[in-house]
């Protein structure tokens, strides 16, 4: 007998993701003007208010208020009725300098021996059930919300959409861990109050709410989902869609009050959405707002890079990689591998881990250089997942009244590149 597995995603307009995007926009601006910046930027967003806090060591000077407002505007919070709007919200900064104790403990004369910025364990995971080596349930949950955001921005259909939204996808697997069908899809989307009651009675209000919900449900099934399906080019995934899927659309009913006005948002509160949707494991450290000296971020990217290349090379159908560090120490304490009994090589998981240790330099500075992490590449990671995205080179422009304007070409999602497959095949004689 098989089993059901569920993953969720949240949109760029979800309050926690608004906070993540502001934190990473601050990080990007600082790295653009001073690549050696040490940054730990936390953001809180609530009704009409943004609060920035954290520790920074940098030679750059940036306009934090302007950065926050630009992010909020890009997401789509541009109307006063949202009670959180890019031009009118307050922006308070409580950012201060990084502790010199931490800096002394991490910096080294030889940059390659730079110590880890903190202790902790980080995980990378990959599975061959999708073309991007991600869990299918999470991949679909992200895709639904990305298409929903595209529809909102186009403004041609579903014109009542507001920025805040969530999705959840439940997949049925057989006993061999193969997806066999999509069981349930949940979509909750914030919307305008686009049908007004005929009078002030409770019955009239209920009728208007039910009419709105009926329209939203119809549009999700007849407009959103066909576009989601059209964006999929994998026959095995397309075969999982059928007319027996259970849809829960705005199951609590009316969803007009949302975003930071409906729920306070904080940086780092969607770490499972950011990674593997509950598959694999998570060490607990968030990503957004942290420069790559923080192994919470850089080592998690490195572990994903390893796991993805190992699965793509055919070492296993599924793999979890753990690395751990002590603060101020460059080399990882351990590398752990779990292939879930789905390995294709005649080795124990411990032996696989030892070969990984030989193939990949996991010192923080080596990770930074291999994955080009000292570049302004992070705002793009802060919505719809840090993993499973498409590596690409883009041109980014930064404007500063203090530092002048700057244009840089950067490579996004370098940890998703399959650039170690050939080396791995040689090492494992595949």
Q: Language-model features: where?
A:
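N-terminal, positively charged regions that mediate nucleic acid binding
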Residues: 1-40, 45, 421, 427
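Glycine-rich, mobile lid/loop segments that gate access to catalytic sites or pores
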Residues: 6, 66, 73-257, 388, ...
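Conserved phosphate/anionic-ligand binding catalytic regions in large, soluble enzymes, centered on
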Residues: 8-10, 14-19, 115-130, 256-281, ...
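Alpha-helical support elements that line or immediately flank enzyme active sites
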Residues: 12-31, 129-149, 290-314
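Structured core elements
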Residues: 40, 51, 92, 122, ...
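Short, charge-patterned binding micro-sites
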Residues: 40-58, 327-331
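Internal helix-turn-beta structural module
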Residues: 46, 316-318, 325-430
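C-terminal catalytic subdomain
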Residues: 269-271, 276-320, 331-338
């Amino acid at each position: 007998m098989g089993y059901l597995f569920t993953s969720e995603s949240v949109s760029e307009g979800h309050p926690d993701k608004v906070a993540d995007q502001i934190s990473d926009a601050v990080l990007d601006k600082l790295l653009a003007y001073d690549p050696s910046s040490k940054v730990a930027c936390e953001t809180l967003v609530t009704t009409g208010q943004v609060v920035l806090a954290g520790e920074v060591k940098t030679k750059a000077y940036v306009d934090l208020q302007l950065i926050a407002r630009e992010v909020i505007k890009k997401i789509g919070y541009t109307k006063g009725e949202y009670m959180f709007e890019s031009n009118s919200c307050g922006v308070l900064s409580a950012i201060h300098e990084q502790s010199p104790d931490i800096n002394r403990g991490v910096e080294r004369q030889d940059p390659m021996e730079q110590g880890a910025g903190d202790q902790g364990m980080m995980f990378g995971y990959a599975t061959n059930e999708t073309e991007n080596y991600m869990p299918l349930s999470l991949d679909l949950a992200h895709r639904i919300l990305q298409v929903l955001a595209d529809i909102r921005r186009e403004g041609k259909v579903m014109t009542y959409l507001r920025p805040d939204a969530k999705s959840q996808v439940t997949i049925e697997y057989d006993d061999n861990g193969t997806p066999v069908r999509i069981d349930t899809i949940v979509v909750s989307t914030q919307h305008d109050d686009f049908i007004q009651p005929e009078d002030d009675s409770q019955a009239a209000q209920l009728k208007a709410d039910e009419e709105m919900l009926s329209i939203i449900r119809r549009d999700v099934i007849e407009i959103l989902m066909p576009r989601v399906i059209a964006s999929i080019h994998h026959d095995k995934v397309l075969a999982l869609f059928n007319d027996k899927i259970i849809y829960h659309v705005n199951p609590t009913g009316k969803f007009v009050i949302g975003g930071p006005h409906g729920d306070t948002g904080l940086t780092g509160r969607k770490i499972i959405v950011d990674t593997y949707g509950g598959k694999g494991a998570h060490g607990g450290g968030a990503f957004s707002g942290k420069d790559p000296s923080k192994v919470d971020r850089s080592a998690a990217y490195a572990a994903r890079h390893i796991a993805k290349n190992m699965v793509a090379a055919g070492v296993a159908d599924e793999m979890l990689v753990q690395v751990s560090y002590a603060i101020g120490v460059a080399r990882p304490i351990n590398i752990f591998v779990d292939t879930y009994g789905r390995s294709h090589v005649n080795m124990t998981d411990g032996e696989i881990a030892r070969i990984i240790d030989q193939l990949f330099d996991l010192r923080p500075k080596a990770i930074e250089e291999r994955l080009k992490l000292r570049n302004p590449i992070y705002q793009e990671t802060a919505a719809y997942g840090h993993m499973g995205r498409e590596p690409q080179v883009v041109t980014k422009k930064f404007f500063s009244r203090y530092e002048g304007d700057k244009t840089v070409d950067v490579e996004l999602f370098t940890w998703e590149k399959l650039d170690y497959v050939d080396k791995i095949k040689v090492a494992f004689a595949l």
